[in-house]
Curated annotation (Swiss-Prot):
<comment type="pathway">
    <text>Glycan degradation; xylan degradation.</text>
</comment>
<dbReference type="GO" id="GO:0045493">
    <property type="term" value="P:xylan catabolic process"/>
</dbReference>
<feature type="signal peptide">
    <location>
        <begin position="1"/>
        <end position="19"/>
    </location>
</feature>
<dbReference type="GO" id="GO:0030245">
    <property type="term" value="P:cellulose catabolic process"/>
</dbReference>
<feature type="active site" description="Charge relay system">
    <location>
        <position position="147"/>
    </location>
</feature>
<keyword id="KW-0732">Signal</keyword>
<dbReference type="Pfam" id="PF10503">
    <property type="entry name" value="Esterase_PHB"/>
</dbReference>
<keyword id="KW-0378">Hydrolase</keyword>
<keyword id="KW-0119">Carbohydrate metabolism</keyword>
<comment type="function">
    <text>Acetylxylan esterase involved in the hydrolysis of xylan, a major structural heterogeneous polysaccharide found in plant biomass representing the second most abundant polysaccharide in the biosphere, after cellulose. Degrades acetylated xylans by cleaving acetyl side groups from the hetero-xylan backbone.</text>
</comment>
<dbReference type="GO" id="GO:0046555">
    <property type="term" value="F:acetylxylan esterase activity"/>
</dbReference>
<dbReference type="InterPro" id="IPR029058">
    <property type="entry name" value="AB_hydrolase_fold"/>
</dbReference>
<keyword id="KW-0325">Glycoprotein</keyword>
<protein>
    <recommendedName>
        <fullName>Acetylxylan esterase A</fullName>
        <ecNumber>3.1.1.72</ecNumber>
    </recommendedName>
</protein>
<dbReference type="GO" id="GO:0005576">
    <property type="term" value="C:extracellular region"/>
</dbReference>
<keyword id="KW-0624">Polysaccharide degradation</keyword>
<keyword id="KW-0719">Serine esterase</keyword>
């Protein structure tokens, strides 16, 4: 009887070790994989990662953030970043919202504060884990997203400017525009969404800079896309977002360096304020603005 109990204890120990190893198995190259143990995850954000089979030494990282109703899988399947990863050897992080409806929390004080314990904090910890796990190049970390993911892109650029070299926001709003005075997570803000939150570049810049109080280091260069016929996040949000980053970088919002018509698509207009800020307004395009993958690669420095 004692011998049987001893054998059972060995088997149970072996089973528990195997289960632990399976739970912590490394991501499979060439497949979207979930990471469940990456350190502090205060808001239970899902962490999915694509590690290419053709992984570069000291790889770059792109954080690709999905829209409302989206998932990591949907953004992986519907965007070109994983395909590009096989060519350029970078890693793609696909966070997944923990909320019903899968919008991102861009409203609470915690997510709008550096190391505040919100969604932004969880995503930043994914970046740190990936840098350490794969010896990634910390100077080549980029962030992009669509709709709610674009809102979070602007928030990440404001709360963790030390982490990112560049950002691209497709159809978002300025960082802090959805702020909830009641400190409610994942709260919709109709005033902002409908383009009624209008302010100066200086004020928008103050809002972004307050998210990492005292920070004086470099900030990610930003590229802002929006459709002129967006009826979900009204196009005024394009202008307000460009105001925000113009204010952050010290550009004169009213005097851009250059406007390029029919760029990168016929009917679209690219406004350049300086090397750190570009805005692209897509004439007649609604909320479902198409990702410009080749242009993204240029902005992130993979191509010229």
């Amino acid at each position: 009887m004692v011998k049987l109990q001893y054998l059972l204890s060995i088997l149970l120990y072996a089973y528990s070790c195997t289960a632990l190893m399976l739970d912590r198995r490394d991501p499979t190259p060439g497949q979207l994989s979930q990471v469940t143990d990456f350190g502090d995850n205060p808001t239970n954000v899902g962490f999915y990662i694509y590690v290419p089979q053709n992984l570069a030494s000291n790889p770059a990282i792109i954080v690709a953030i999905h829209y409302c109703t989206g998932t990591a899988q949907a953004y992986y399947s519907g965007t070109p970043y994983a395909q590009y990863a096989e060519t350029y050897g970078f890693i793609v992080i696909y966070p997944e919202s923990p909320y019903s409806g899968t919008c991102w929390d861009v409203s609470s004080q915690s997510t709008l504060t550096h190391n505040g314990g919100g969604n932004s904090n969880s995503i930043a910890n994914m970046v740190d884990w990936t840098i350490n796990q794969y010896n990634a190049d910390a100077s080549r970390v980029y962030v992009t997203g669509t709709s709610s993911g674009a809102m979070m892109t602007n928030v990440m650029a404001a709360t963790y400017p030390n982490l990112f070299a560049a950002g691209i926001a497709y159809a978002g709003v300025p960082a802090g525009c959805f702020y909830s005075e009641a400190n409610v997570e994942d709260q919709w803000n109709s005033t902002c969404a409908q383009g009624q939150s209008i302010s100066t570049p200086e004020h928008w810049a103050q809002i972004a800079q307050a998210m990492y109080s005292g920070y004086e280091g470099s900030r990610p260069k930003m590229q802002i896309y929006h459709g002129s016929a967006d009826a979900t996040l009204y196009p005024q949000n394009y202008y307000e977002t460009c105001k925000q980053w113009a204010g952050v970088f010290g550009y004169n919002y009213d005097s851009p360096q250059e406007v390029q018509n029919d760029t990168p698509v016929a009917g679209w207009a690219k406004t350049i304020w300086g090397e750190n800020l570009q805005g692209i307004l897509a004439d007649g395009v609604g909320h479902n603005i198409q990702i410009q993958g080749e242009e993204d690669l240029k902005w992130f420095g993979f191509t010229s």
